Amino acid sequence: MLGDGNEGMATIPGFNQIQFEGFCRFIDQGLAEELYKFPKIEDTDQEIEFQLFVETYQLVEPLIKERDAVYELLTYSSELYVSAGLIWKTGRDMQEQTIFIGNIPLMNSLGTFIVNGVYRILINQILQSPGIYYRSELDHNGISVYTGTIISDWGGRSELEIDRKARIWARVSRKQKISILVLSSAMGSNLREILENVCYPEIFLSFLNDKERKKIGSKENAILEFYQQFACVGGDPVFSESLCKELQKKFFQQRCELGRIGRRNMNRRLNLDIPQNNPFLLPRDILAAADHLIGLKFGMGTLDDMNHLKNKRIRSVADLLQDQFGLALVRLENAVRGTICGAIRHKLIPTPQNLVTSTPLTTTYESFFGLHPLSQVLDGTNPLTQIVHGRKLSYLGPGGLTGRTANFRIRDIHPSHYGRICPIDTSEGINVGLIGSLSIHARIGHWGFLESPFYEISERRVLFLLPGRDEYYKVAAGNSLALNQDIQEKQVVPARYRQEFLTIAWEQVHLRSIFPFQYFSIGASLIPFIEHNDANRALMSSNMQRQAVPLSRSEKCIVGTGLEQQAALDSGALSIAEREGKVLYTDTDKILLSGNGGTLSIPLVMYQRSNKNTCMHQKPRVQRGKCIKKGQILADAAATVGGELSLGKNVLVAYMPWEGYNFEDAVLISERLVYEDIYTSFHIRKYEIQTHVTSQGPERVTNEIPHLEAHLLRNLDKSGIVMLGSWVETGDILVGKLTPQMVKESSYAPEDRLLRAILGIQVSTSKETCLKLPIGGRGRVIDVRWIQKKGGSSYNPEMIRVYISQKREIKVGDKVAGRHGNKGIISKILTRQDMPYLQDGRPVDMVFNPLGVPSRMNVGQIFECSLGLAGSLLDRHYRIAPFDERYEQEASRKLVFSELYQASKQTANPWVFEAEYPGKSRIFDGRTGNPFEQPVLIGKPYILKLIHQVDDKIHGRSSGHYALVTQQPLRGRAKQGGQRVGEMEVWALEGFGVAHILQEMLTYKSDHIRARQEVLGTTIVGGTIPNPEDAPESFRLLVRELRSLALELKHFLISEKNFRIHRKEA
């Protein structure tokens, strides 16, 4: 990472490097480790022995390409072959064969996997590292209780605690605890060995009474006592081999296997020298832990911070895949054992080929990628989303936390996160703080710990330090880029030391950071002037950049941070030259390259759909006849320009109120953004249908569909599938399909049968089950795929997929956002002549609410806005590093004002920079031509169009389904649901006195079954709709629920006459 010639200079690592390193570690080490664990398998008579020869395993290159795997819904994987031998002990013969044991999914160049045609990615998980941790809690009397928690490699926990009388207990369950002497004796130590291996033997002897001596008199007695407490069994259990096996399986295996990481942590914490190859908890560990617990009781030793990253480990791609491979080998072992016994029973001669099946490995990985919480579908909204998804860190998942149980302390930022986990980038909502993102330079070490690089000043080299190690050094904060080394060495600088901030002389500094963005994730590093923003708004910006839609014509940002090119390059979306050569031919779908005596055809991505329905497309940026070098960019992708990430557009913005249309973060825009396709994007929707073989026969795809109007079938070809290039509207048939059915003549009404007999209509033997275009799906058909699988059975159906492209201009209801957490909904589209205009006559494109800045404390947008205006006038682009105040005070403001002043001079426009109100200008009302009373901030920020679009959200219900229990309309757009009129909505309607509307909402349009039917009848016949007289279904449901609680509701009328009668009787 550090070159010899330029000391102190560091390069940014590949953003997908963590995924690649994890998968390579699994292939190089993890496979062999698990294969070596595979045992020798013998039959019951011990005549035949089966074993694997691990030294000769091999992975075969995949037979299909990545694109073909996606197209044909297959898994991009490699076949694993291992040599296996079958030994007959009687004749000492051995048969050896190379066997196929299954497919292992391969990682592609994007750091993702292709499983059943879907791009999936594995998320890194943060777990508590195995080892021992000491903490202190106050009991109900306010006295400190010290406990030591031993965490195993499996995630099981055992606790040691010391009471007021300095007695040490091992807690085996929430309610049961036993003496540590019993636990040590059950693990194989006698009293003499215990007293010899502890530092405080007199304390152990102090609570040793006769009853305790009897319990630890022998190992068998200790095991019986331990089993009685652990299993909570009464009576007197008898010592047996099965009892020991049960204890071994349920307790020792789950709670006492530390693993190599746990053994390392235990040795370090307790100053032990137990060999690393001994992964199990030993009596010596228990006694050393008890000694440390006694020391804490008497004020010696330190407690552990459970949230420190030195006490966490990363479960990476390698660990997840290795665990699943081990699980598959266990299943394979059971299958081989059963097959051998079956072959011997039926007197067959087995071979290694016959004994091994590929099903366990293949099905294990398929279920893992399909069901595991840490295996997620790749989010492909834009190139930034793809690269950020693989760098996520999650506390959730198997063995981790849940959103309900995680407390605030776990979610909070910790000093050890510095340079390892981004303090900004996390999810919003219930998982805040539980899903984080890796810092740019962080890497996962060999032991699963997060490491961060620092520059060692004395040795002039870059060090990668583990969590906790940097606390022993004085680390200068933010001194990576110095304008003048001599000036820097004389100054007093802020530094970190033992999780505290100090101000020390430069000579006392040991380490310094190597990069200004070292502490942030990729998303946060793309925010210019981030130091001027509130952290909550920066968090929103990091998330919203991942929701930006690729536009039809992308544009570079005028004000950036310098990481845009690296982010685009590592996303894998660009087409990169793999060798030198000359461009022979360029087209929209390929580039021909000559070099090294051959011609290379490089295919380009054309109108490919992402899983968020955005359009992924590559555009050539090299010309015919040009010579290119290896690593040069051949084609731009969606949302990139010139190899730089380009998610939005630089538009002219004014911060001012306008007739209330930008109230509460609403945004007013010009019609220019619509007519000139500034924010136009393409979206590709996928519609699919399957053809099955039913009990009545196979389903047919045809264009001859009875009882359907001809114009609905106008786009179908001879085979019944929509033609490429067709324009389709809502309700059109995309795929014509008929499903066979058996209909008896007796099932029809008599008048139907009479009409059929008179008109000669035959009984239909099939029903129409066509694929129809749903509401909001209008567009152009760009691709049709008929995936025909072998067999064609009902379990292996054929599938037809139709891809339709939509062109969406920006409209009222769409969501736009800047890069500083400033988001809003389009409220009105004004004509150009009505928009406020500048002193040079240019109308602004957007009007933002100025009240959205001071309360949100995201002042960075003001700097970006003004600097963007100066850059557009000077035709310059700026790349701003964060925390530029380390050079001088008010550096950001000085830069912006100097560029505005220069733009004002060069363009001869004095309104660009006015000394009375720098950054602001007087603008005019487009409707009247009069200037506004106050000067207004104008500029050119970078504004994104987000995936939250009104076309995907707007919905109306005319008819639809009702819930079975409440008989009220379903909820949700996908179910054609209705809009709920709740309690507060009813109050609002009551306030306006709209009795009839209120009655309709609560009866006819909701859950009054009889009233609904009467409305339908009277609408068809014509007449007055009767008022409902009985109770709606929801009230009936309430009555039934009360009855289930043994409460009966009755009603009766009380008149004055009845009241007097009841009063006399009383």
From Swiss-Prot:
InterPro entries: DNA-dir_RNA_pol_bsu_ext_1_sf, DNA-dir_RNA_pol_su2, DNA-dir_RNAP_su2_dom, DNA-dir_RNAP_su2_hyb_sf, RNA_pol_bsu_bac, RNA_pol_bsu_CS, RNA_pol_bsu_protrusion, RNA_pol_Rpb2_2. Its EC number is 2.7.7.6. It catalyses: RNA(n) + a ribonucleoside 5'-triphosphate = RNA(n+1) + diphosphate. It comes from the Eukaryota. One of its GO terms (biological process) is DNA-templated transcription. Keywords: Chloroplast, DNA-directed RNA polymerase, Nucleotidyltransferase, Plastid, Transcription, Transferase. Its main location: plastid. Pfam families: RNA_pol_Rpb2_1 (PF04563), RNA_pol_Rpb2_2 (PF04561), RNA_pol_Rpb2_3 (PF04565), RNA_pol_Rpb2_6 (PF00562), RNA_pol_Rpb2_7 (PF04560). It is an enzyme of class 2 (transferase). Coiled coil: none annotated. The keyword Plastid applies. Belongs to the RNA polymerase beta chain family. DNA-dependent RNA polymerase catalyzes the transcription of DNA into RNA using the four ribonucleoside triphosphates as substrates. This is DNA-directed RNA polymerase subunit beta. It comes from Coffea arabica.
